[in-house]
Amino acid sequence: MIPFNPVEALSNLISIRSFSKEEEPARNLIESILTTYEISFTIDLNNIWAKNKHFDSSKHTILLNSHLDTVKPNKGYTKDPFYPHSENGKLYGLGSNDAGGALVTLLGTFLHFHNEKDLPFNLVFAASAEEEISGKNGMEFLFSRLPKIDFAIVGEPTLLDIAIAEKGLMVLDCKSIGKSAHAARNEGVNAIYEAINDINWFSSYVFPKQSDETGTVNMTVTQVKSGSQHNVVPSECDFVVDVRINDKYSNNEVLNIIKSNVKCEVSARSTRLNSSGISSNHPIRIVAEKLNINTYGSPTLSDQSLMPCESVKMGPGDSARSHTADEFIYIDELEQAIPKYIAVLTQLGEELMVS
């Protein structure tokens, strides 16, 4: 069997347009690789997944997951986003860093373990859709169709460090209500002033529960809209708040605290993108310590938020490069990733056997 080449696989992936909801051609590439290695797989919409050959339902099952979709290229690109171009140790192309590098190296890791007998765990590899838009037909659709998952490694660019916690997200649509009047008459109730009081609360309130990994809950007002003309006191003021929730709160808990402290109407677009974290005694913490891998809390969102199991985030590449013009990943990052994943899973297997 031809050895798996992650650089070649990623180059092929880059050359395929795979925007959210348009992942089928990229999914077909993963299908062709699994077919080459004679591995059975299941297709669910634009998602594809496979189990290790000697799957045993009595064992713990670990999910290896990353996403097929990319954002659309921005106007700052100077290179063809769909042409995999190597230069000075870098592989350029849309999705190379977020998260094609993680996807192909997790696939390579799965191929390494697939045929092994007597693994101390099961492995499921899943290439999922719609991560970039937190869509309904990606991991949210797929997870219930997988075997029971005990733990997940989600492939995202982390410099191959391990993110042991991740902030959740809520977007709030807020509306302050006033009473319109002629601006010259010093009458009415100015909805903008009403909104300012609540906006000041959003900017200054500190949630009491702090996290060692993800810090505090952050609330940022990102949009404000009010008024129709210069001489009318506005009766409504709409504003949007971006809320990043640490792993000490659920989204609903934070939403209830907000509603009890502000006067404006508050509506959450969604409460499903919760924070994630692992228990203080989880074996992956011991693995990271033994392998001298840095751990941290991530402020950015991934499909972890849609997984009702403990999970970490780990992968080649740098989150700072995600969604940037002329996106790239270092080739040596790809070369280091599979051995690092293998070491983590091997050590994790030893810890599971001890526990």
Where are the regions a protein language model picked out?
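N-terminal helical capping/dimerization or prosegment-like subdomains
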Residues: 1-73, 236-240, 254-257, 331-342
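Short glycine/proline-enriched coil/turn segments at helix->beta-strand junctions
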Residues: 5, 35-39, 44-46, 58-59, ...
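Predominant activation on well-ordered alpha-helical scaffold segments within soluble catalytic domains
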Residues: 11, 31, 104-107, 111, ...
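Generic recognition of short, well-ordered alpha-helical segments
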Residues: 25, 104, 137-138, 186, ...
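Active-site metal-coordination/substrate-binding segment of hydrolases
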Residues: 59-124
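Hydrophobic/aromatic beta-strand patches that form the interior of the parallel beta-sheet core
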Residues: 62-64, 126, 151-153, 312-314
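Metal-dependent amide/peptide-bond hydrolase catalytic core
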Residues: 164, 173-355
